[in-house]
């Protein structure tokens, strides 16, 4: 009976509890994982509803670039990697089969935001066409970056017949990622708007910097900073003002900085550029940027929590639950230090069990809730209509 009552108290996955300290220490591993497993949500249904609002099917498979001969040729080469464990195949699977939990619908959010405001001009149809193009190129840039991150480091001294598929996969990842980024930049130039070009280019700069932020292992996988005492959790979304020494080792600051650099600023700048194309004032543009960043951070926190509570699989060592656990129990950093050369050497099951014994899960839920509420507050400042209501559904359903 005591077990049942504990389970009922933890039944809601994203409604954080008032008490932060963990009450899970007395449970077994299996009991903890059952309690934390997120419930099924009809995400695909919400996506279809949102696409009806914008009047456009926004999945990546519908992007016009996929109809080109160049992409078709690359897809043929990509098929040769079927059955291999190359990282580029995992990314391709997420894109082609619509794994929305790994690839959130950023383009759809930008289009919904575009529909939420009235364009102060008679040529609203042409503006919305530009905003749709902006949504597409934002998705392409993000996907191209993810594919480039799928490159596997194969030291020259270790190359042999067994590594041939890795080397071939790297060539495909480079070509495919380059194609998407070049096509996206061509579409961006086609908008013929210098201000939009500057805003989106700022996000591309952030994506590049994300690959050099903090320590990395031999495969360029991120390693968290050594835990430090935190006196202030506040951090700006203006990436030019973020200093690595000021955030590394400080759980929320480090997580926010890494996540913003690693793509969230692209979503924020995409939302900002959408308002710029829609002839909105600077205040509305700033609201849109803040909204986009908070949406991206909320979704990332939710995705990381779901990844952690899966029964199997490797999770990111710089995810929010890990960083919060290190804050609560700095001794856990010894487990990570032992795998500094290759993060795969970490005993993830043992690390997961130790994480779940801290208050990291509660804090990650609070992190999601905090950014979701802030995102809704910013979108309320922009508009009140069907598009805004649909954005709120997307935030809450994820």
Name each region found by the language model.
Residues 2-166, 214-249, 372, 392-398:
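Conserved N-terminal diphosphate/IPP-binding helix and adjacent helical/loop segment
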Residues 24-42, 112-121, 146-167, 185, ...:
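Acidic, Mg2+-coordinating active-site segments of isoprenoid diphosphate-utilizing enzymes
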Residues 67, 71, 131-134, 197-200, ...:
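Hydrophobic packing residues in well-ordered alpha-helices of helical domains and bundles
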Residues 72, 142, 178, 182, ...:
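Generic structural signal for well-ordered, non-transmembrane alpha-helical segments
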Residues 171, 250-262:
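A short glycine-threonine-serine/GTX helix/turn-capping micro-motif
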Residues 173-183, 187:
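Post-HExxH zinc-binding segment in Zn-dependent metallohydrolases
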Residues 185-204:
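Transmembrane helix-loop-helix
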Residues 377, 384-398:
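Short, amphipathic C-terminal "tail helix"
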């Amino acid at each position: 009976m005591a077990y049942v009552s504990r389970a009922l108290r933890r039944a809601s996955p994203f409604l954080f509890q008032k008490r932060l300290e963990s009450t899970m220490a007395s449970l077994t591993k299996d009991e903890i994982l059952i309690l934390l497993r997120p419930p099924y949500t009809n995400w695909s249904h919400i996506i279809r509803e949102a696409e009806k609002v914008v009047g456009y099917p926004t999945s990546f498979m519908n992007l016009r670039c996929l109809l080109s001969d160049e992409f078709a040729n690359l897809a043929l080469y990509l098929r040769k990697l079927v059955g291999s464990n190359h990282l580029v195949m995992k990314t391709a699977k997420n894109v082609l089969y619509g794994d929305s939990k790994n690839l959130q619908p950023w383009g759809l959010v930008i289009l919904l935001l575009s529909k939420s405001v009235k364009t102060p001009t008679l040529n609203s149809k042409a503006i919305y066409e530009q905003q749709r193009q902006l949504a597409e190129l934002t998705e392409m840039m993000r996907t191209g970056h993810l594919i480039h991150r799928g490159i596997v480091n194969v030291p020259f001294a270790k190359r042999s017949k067994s590594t041939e598929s890795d080397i071939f996969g790297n060539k495909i990842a480079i070509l495919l990622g380059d194609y998407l980024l070049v096509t996206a930049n061509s579409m961006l130039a086609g908008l013929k708007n210098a201000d939009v070009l500057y805003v989106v280019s700022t996000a591309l700069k952030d994506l590049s910097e994300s690959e050099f932020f903090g320590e990395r292992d031999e495969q360029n996988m991120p390693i968290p900073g050594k835990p430090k005492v935190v006196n202030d959790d506040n951090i700006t979304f203006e990436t030019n003002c973020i200093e690595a020494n000021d955030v590394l080792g400080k759980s929320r600051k480090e997580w926010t900085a890494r996540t913003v650099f690693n793509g969230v600023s692209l979503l924020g700048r995409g939302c900002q550029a959408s308002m710029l194309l829609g002839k909105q004032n600077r205040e509305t543009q700033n609201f849109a940027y803040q909204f986009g960043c908070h949406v991206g951070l909320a979704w990332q926190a939710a995705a990381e929590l779901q990844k952690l509570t899966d029964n199997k699989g490797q999770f990111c060592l710089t995810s929010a639950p890990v960083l919060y656990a290190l804050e609560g129990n700095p001794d856990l950093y010894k487990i990570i230090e032992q795998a500094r050369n290759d993060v795969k050497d970490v005993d993830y099951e043992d690390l997961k069990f130790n994480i779940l014994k801290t208050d990291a899960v509660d804090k990650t839920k609070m992190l999601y809730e905090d950014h979701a509420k802030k995102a809704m507050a910013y979108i309320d400042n922009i508009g009140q209509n069907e598009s805004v209501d649909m954005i709120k559904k997307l935030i809450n359903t994820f």
